[in-house]
Every structure is written in C-alpha cells, then in structure tokens.
Regions:
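Amphipathic, interaction-prone secondary-structure segments
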Residues: 11-52
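Mixed-charge, Lys/Arg-enriched low-complexity segments
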Residues: 2-8, 52-128
Length: 128
C-alpha cells in the first residue's frame, strides 16, 4: 500500500486477521491503533477500539482520544474514530499517515520490553 494521508475513517485501510480487523495511523513517533475484533471493546457489535502508543512501546493516555484513566477507548462508531484521528493531528501538530514503509520504520525503533505498569505514561503534548 502506498503511503497516504489519513484525515477520516473512510481514508483508513484495514488489515484482516483471524479475530477481526485493524488499522494504524502514524503521527511522527506516535501511533494510533484502531481495532475491531472479538476481543476489543465493542468489536462484537461492529464498533471500534482505539489505543495510542509511543515509538518506544509505551501506552499513552491522550486527552480527548483515550479514556482519562485507561490507554484505550472502546465502543466507537466510525464518526468517533474520525474525531480521534483529527484530534491526534490537532494535538501532535502533524497529519496522520498510513502505508508505505511507515509501519516498518516505526517498528524498528527501540521498543521497551517491560511489564505494562512500568511503561505506561500520560503525555502532555503542550510540553513536548
């Protein structure tokens, strides 16, 4: 798939797997994951779950995107996913992208391999 700009849900290209489907949007060193599968919040109802990750493998709480005390947000419609995509562009200051070598480049950056409690964090994008 060629690299493309992602501004709304209908721009996404999903990958199917045994449990459902997933997509990602990369904002420089931040990744927005969008999933719909039998294990995701709302997936059995055809709704989506999103999560945000830094390129070092940390889950990130993002105001207006994830839940305030959780690293994911579930039970989302396509319209709500579009809101999250646009909110991520707004707070990171970059346009989300998908495809090409983006995922390979993102995955090859150093990733922490620690238990989840030790690498979770909340990001204040105003201080970056």
């Amino acid at each position: 798939m060629k690299e493309k700009v992602i501004d709304k849900f209908s721009d996404l290209s999903f990958t199917k797997d045994y449990a459902g489907k997933s997509a990602y949007v990369i904002y420089d060193n931040i990744l927005l994951s969008i999933v719909c599968n039998e294990y995701s919040y709302g997936g059995k109802s055809g709704l989506y779950e999103i999560g945000v990750f830094s390129n070092d493998g940390r889950n990130i709480i993002v105001d207006g995107v994830t839940e305030s005390e959780d690293f994911v947000r579930g039970w989302l419609s396509a319209k709500a996913v579009t809101h999250a995509i646009r909110r991520m562009s707004e707070i990171t200051g970059v346009v989300g992208r998908q495809g090409g070598d983006l995922m390979f480049e993102w995955n090859t950056k150093e990733v922490l391999h620690q238990d989840s409690e030790s690498y979770q964090k909340t990001v204040n994008f105003n201080n970056m």
